[in-house]
A protein has these predicted regions:
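Amphipathic alpha-helical membrane/lipid-surface binding segments
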Residues: 290-293, 297-359
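Pocket-flanking alpha-helical
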Residues: 37, 54-92, 167-173, 179, ...
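Segments of small-molecule ligand-sensing domains
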Residues: 233-313, 361-363
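Bilobed "Venus flytrap"/periplasmic-binding protein-like clamshell domains
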Residues: 21-47, 52, 104-170, 175, ...
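Sec/Tat signal peptide C-region and signal peptidase I cleavage site
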Residues: 15-20
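Pocket-lining segment of extracytoplasmic ligand-binding domains
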Residues: 78-81, 113-114, 139-142, 147-247, ...
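Sec-dependent N-terminal signal peptides
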Residues: 4-14
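A structural signal for short loop-to-beta-strand junctions that line the ligand-binding cleft
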Residues: 90-104, 231-242
């Protein structure tokens, strides 16, 4: 039955027949495909493996492709990998090749100056409007993962809308005080999105909370608190930095025991050993934007993280009495409404009863 399920997934893969030597990336213009995959393709070619970078719809799509053909390779966000893996067989289906060479960061955007931390977002989730990129995007998947992690906060969001891309999500978030956009990307101070946020009066909210940072998969942390630069320094003005949660970029393939042919299985094992033995520098660009960005990105110390987590928790605690009072008022209102409905029901019942006829008076 499992082989049949994988075959069904293969039929659903966009672009027709898939190849066993695919390195599934993401959008053709995205960082996975243009920045990271070429280095991996080069290293595999040197080891006599003929793998080619292949565009895809992102992490979830890559996982479906590897589930269908264990010899393929996929890039993805660790949080999405953790979210989707159980439904596809987990450790029986996937082998992680690389786990934490580089990280993507989660950004929350709003124009509301009263929202300054994740706790503010969490306690107001039922009243906020959340705008996300498409449902199949890594950003939307990250938000679903955060909802699973924060059952008393963002899980209670009642208004979640998906739009065409992160740029549109940001535009909508900057149009109203009750709106927040979430998106995931590699921190890049040259990216026009960060400039737009600043120019239009918006700000980035640190996506940091104990419920987020405690998440793990197979003993590995899913999110790390990092400080990263989002705007470059200007004359007489330093660059803008933000602290937020970042999730590792994971590289994965299928488990060798799912490869039925003996020679193909051994080749697959050799490929796995080759990639796992590579040094980090061999898989990252040595020059250009990303090498500069990651030199300006640092993981926070435990003490610094605790201070930020406390800010989020304080926001939740301050809101708790108001939330409880709102529940009480809501309960009282419901009880009064129920009593009013019962009275109206009784009044209607009496109105429907026939009026008794009086006996005629004697003449």
């Amino acid at each position: 039955m499992k082989q049949l399920a994988y075959a069904t997934i293969a039929l659903l893969i966009p672009g027709g027949i898939a190849s066993a030597n695919q390195i599934n990336t993401g959008g053709a213009q995205g960082a996975y495909h243009t920045t990271f995959c070429p280095a991996l393709e080069t290293q595999l070619s040197r080891a006599k493996f003929d793998h080619k970078c292949t565009p895809s719809e992102g992490t979830a799509d890559n996982m479906s492709r590897v589930a269908a053909d264990p010899r393929q390779i996929g890039y993805g966000q660790l949080d999405i990998f953790a979210l989707e893996a159980p439904a596809l067989g987990g450790a029986k289906t996937f082998t992680k090749l690389r786990g934490d060479d580089v990280r993507e960061c989660v950004f929350a955007v709003t124009r509301n100056r009263e929202i300054t931390n994740f706790g503010d977002i969490a306690v107001n989730a039922p009243r906020l409007r959340f705008i996300l990129p498409p449902k199949t995007s890594g950003s939307a998947g990250t938000f679903r993962f955060l909802q699973q992690a924060d059952t008393e906060g963002v899980a209670k969001a009642k208004s979640v809308e998906n739009v065409a891309n992160a740029d549109e999500a940001i535009k909508l978030a900057l149009s109203a005080d009750d709106t927040v956009a979430f998106f995931v990307q590699f921190p890049d101070p040259n990216n026009a999105r960060f400039k737009t946020i600043q120019a239009q009066g918006g700000h980035l909210v640190p996506v940091l909370d104990r419920a987020i940072l405690r998440q793990q998969i197979d003993g590995q942390k899913v999110y790390f608190a990092q400080e990263t630069q989002v705007l470059n320094a200007k004359w007489m003005k330093s660059g803008q930095k933000v602290v937020t949660a970042c999730t590792p970029l994971v590289l994965f393939t299928g488990t060798p025991d799912r490869v039925t042919n003996d020679k193909a299985r051994q080749d697959h094992k050799d490929m796995i050993a080759t990639v796992q033995a590579l040094k980090v520098d061999a898989l990252l660009p040595r020059e250009g934007l990303f090498s500069k960005v990651w030199r300006r990105t640092r993981e926070l110390s435990g003490q610094s993280v605790e201070k930020l987590v406390q800010i989020s928790e304080t926001a939740r605690e301050k809101a708790q009495p108001m939330m409880e009072r709102a529940k009480e008022l809501g309960g009282e209102a419901m009880e009064k409404a129920r009593e009013a409905a019962e009275k109206a029901k009784e009044a209607a019942k009496k109105a429907m009863e026939p009026t008794p006829t009086e006996p005629p008076k004697p003449q």
